[in-house]
Amino acid sequence: MDTEADLFYRQLPKVELHAHLNGSVSFETMEKLIKRKPHLNIEHSMTAIRRGQRRTLDECFQVFKVIHQLVDSEEDILMVAKSVIQEFAADGVKYLELRSTPREVTETGLSKQRYIETVLEAIRQCKQEGVDIDVRFLVAVDRRHGPEVAMQTVKLAEDFLLSSDGTVVGLDLSGDPTVGHGKDLLAALQKAKNCGLKLALHLSEVPSQIDETELLLNLPPDRIGHGTFLHPDVGGSDSLVDKVCKQNIPIEICLTSNVKGQTVPSYDKHHFKYWYNRGHPCVLCTDDKGVFCTDLSQEYQLAASTFGLTKEAVWILSQQAIGYTFAPEPIKQRLEKTWAELKQQILQ
């Protein structure tokens, strides 16, 4: 990790709602994977964007390709998922929604079904081992793979929504935003919504996607990932902002990811400020803590130092995130109770 966050931000109970499994793999876990697969000739520099470095969004997607080569069997997925969950818990995250695109790898016999089952097994094992975190899973649709695969993924997600005892709660739409068009995936997303899956969609991650965003906001999604170019100052439109505000759709904010991936020029120019000042629901997230060398404590500290938030304001930001989770009501109530219990000792 680049810098240690202060104790207050570490102790702060947190909710993480935008975390891609493969992008969240830490330096230490990468080390183990690289050692296990020397024939791939992969170096650390290929899997993480170090401090002060910037990459284009395209280069960031190249990093994921490398990570996918390292994580290609059930054994890898189990190890990676468990370590990611443990690391979030160690950082004071009390509730986590992980997301990942189910993949099949013929060489290792991995199927999409087994991919999801293995992530669920990792979640189960962490719970059994007493790791202090509640974890749910969003099945991801990679937009690059087109409408047919999207429909198959939705079908899988639907099956797991019914069979995973509440662990699978929703669907994520992600992948390279410059590939494909949302209109081709609309039917699959609508089907997901109809069967009770919550939708977290990456929207307006790159400029000039007004038509697609307009279309997808009509669904509407339950949360927006990034939403970097929604407002008119950055090439979005008033009508997009109105839609988002009218429907009160929470925005998943990923500060470090956007700055290191160069979709935002600097922290102080981040769109968090625009939405936060409007009083719109925002939740701070890491996106890919491994790739971008960050953690959620750091993201909170960055937001506080960049935008002058008091500890009280930071606490409220963290607590409000409970309401934006896809967790069932009893879980939300339990989390509220946890926050209330911790407030006195942490917020002095």
UniProtKB/Swiss-Prot annotation:
Pfam families reported in the protein's UniProt record: A_deaminase
One of the protein's GO biological processes? inosine biosynthetic process
Q: In the UniProt entry, which residues are flagged as the active site? A: 205 (proton donor)
Return the SUPFAM superfamilies for the record.
Metallo-dependent hydrolases
Q: What is its EC number?
A: 3.5.4.-
Q: Which residues are involved in binding Zn(2+)?
A: 18, 20, 202, 287
Q: Which cofactors is this protein said to need?
A: Zn(2+)
Q: Which residues bind N(6)-methyl-AMP?
A: 20, 22, 68, 100-103, 142, 175, 205, 287-288
Q: What does the cofactor field's note say? A: Binds 1 zinc ion per subunit.
Q: Which GO terms describe its molecular function?
A: adenosine deaminase activity; metal ion binding; N6-methyl-AMP deaminase activity
Chain positions of site Important for catalytic activity: 226
Which keywords label this protein?
Hydrolase, Metal-binding, Nucleotide metabolism, Zinc
PANTHER family named among the record's database cross-references: ADENOSINE DEAMINASE (PTHR11409), ADENOSINE DEAMINASE-LIKE PROTEIN (PTHR11409:SF42)
Identify its protein family: Belongs to the metallo-dependent hydrolases superfamily. Adenosine and AMP deaminases family.
- What is the documented function of this protein? Catalyzes the hydrolysis of the free cytosolic methylated adenosine nucleotide N(6)-methyl-AMP (N6-mAMP) to produce inositol monophosphate (IMP) and methylamine. Is required for the catabolism of cytosolic N6-mAMP, which is derived from the degradation of mRNA containing N6-methylated adenine (m6A).
Q: How does it assemble?
A: Monomer.
Protein name according to UniProt: N6-Methyl-AMP deaminase
Native source organism of the sequence: Danio rerio (Zebrafish)
Q: Per UniProt, what is the name of the gene that codes for the protein in this document?
A: mapda
